[in-house]
Amino acid sequence: RGGAAFVDMDGEFWRDLIDQNLVLTALCGRAEAKAMLAQGRGGVIINVSSGETTRPSPYMGAYGAAKAGINHLTQTMAVELGPSGIRVVAIAPGTTLTEQVRAAFDDEHVAAIRESNPLRTMTEPEELGRLTVFLASDLARCITGQLILADAGAHLSRTRPPNRSPSQ
């Protein structure tokens, strides 16, 4: 449950989305940080944000706001945990060509998403996996507190794919 018209988002809707996204990320990060601090060897915490935080989208206000909270949380965690050798980064995927997306959108809508961004493609789940491995590796040891957009350049685009209301 992520999309609804702004005027239809009641308090329960907001609380559910914030709990599912921001609060759970914070609690998981807390548990990871405590374990890493106890081991004393540093580590990497990778949060999952969303490309929805980079530009407004109809019907995605609560989801985008919750994910934007993850971006700030990531920076705060990086500042607090960095002196202990713990890096914290966030990955912000755009629309990713998962089975769920394939089931939700027809071929025409998927093509419109591809054409609406500079690389004329969509992120594949495997690409997010490779990005995660890189960020967790020593090759990225100087990266912390960053939001890494993995959206085929969609955040740069002036056009958006056709909007779909939550009921479509």
Question: For each predicted feature, which ranges?
Answer:
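Short C-terminal tail/terminal secondary-structure segment
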Residues: T144-Q168
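Alpha-helical segment proximal to the catalytic Tyr-Lys
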Residues: K34, V79-P83, R141
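Substrate-binding pocket helix/loop in short-chain dehydrogenase/reductase
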Residues: G2-F6, D10-I18, I113
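C-terminal helical subdomain
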Residues: A90, E108-I143, A150-A152
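Active-site loop-to-helix junction immediately N-terminal to the catalytic Tyr of the SDR YXXXK motif
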Residues: A4, P56-G64, T76, P161
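Residue(s) in the substrate-gating loop at a strand-loop-helix junction
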Residues: S50
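Active-site helix of classical SDR
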Residues: G29, A66, T74
